[in-house]
Amino acid sequence: MDRKIQYTYRNLQNEIALILEAKVSEDWRCNIWHVRGSERDLIIDTGLGLWPITKDIFQISERPIIALCTHSHHDHAGGLSQFETRAGHPAEKNIFANPTRQSTVANLIKPEHLIEKPYESFEIEKWCMNPAPITNLVQEGDVIDLGNRNLKVLHFPGHSPGSIALWEEKTGTMFTGDTLYDGVLYDHLYHSVPEIFKESLWRLREFPIDTIHAGHSSSFGKEKMNIIIDEYMSGKRSMLCPSQR
């Protein structure tokens, strides 16, 4: 791999782009979404942040950037400190401001999750994301105004207390973070609550969704969404054994 390639950038429909950390393994890296507006742009989740992401983004867009994290886990919020305008839910504001390996679940990441280290002496087993105090607290019903488009904040707790999604009604697009993706759903973490997680998934079904851009894996539509939710409810996509659910 070219040592200079730290992020890949792929344009999708509706002025949305997918950014990926090229040196983080596919099974661990999160999807970083770039939503372009007429007056400002939105970055949804920021990855591990082991490499400078803002330099690449500012070469692509000259508009002001809002960086919003769907939750405070290290693989989504590690790069948040690189941005001046930082949005997140109040339930996890203390984690963003005072992160530890335990509170951000960085104690789960292993050396094999990195294809290449940011520098030779780097030890992922000791790494913790930088503090990133939230400048813009967002809650259920708040609207992120990008000029020619708006995204509504939805609170979907369960995976974590402050997990949020973003809904663009005009295009039927939902950004779900770790509330829903095509994989085994993490409902076993220290602040996960499976029963609340289920309620959030039932609520997700109510939206007239065309496309889900998730926190991990490929994007998908409503039919696939319903299959994933049904499989989770039956225990197939849960990290917990039946007695724990």
Model-derived features with residue positions:
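Short solvent-exposed loop/turn micro-motifs enriched in small/polar/acidic residues
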Residues: 1-3, 26-28, 72, 128-130, ...
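Conserved beta-strand hairpin/beta-sheet module of binuclear metal-dependent hydrolase folds
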Residues: 6-59, 165-181
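Structural signal for conserved beta-strand scaffold positions within catalytic alpha/beta enzyme cores
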Residues: 11, 18, 69, 87-88, ...
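Short Pro/Gly-enriched beta-strand edge/turn motifs at strand-loop
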Residues: 13-20, 122-127, 147-149
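Short histidine/acidic/glycine/proline-rich micro-motifs that form metal-
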Residues: 25, 92-93, 218-220
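A general structural motif
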Residues: 39, 62-64, 209
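Metallo-beta-lactamase
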Residues: 41-43, 48-49, 129, 133-136, ...
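Active-site HxH/HxHxD metal-binding segment of metal-dependent hydrolases
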Residues: 50-143, 224, 230-242
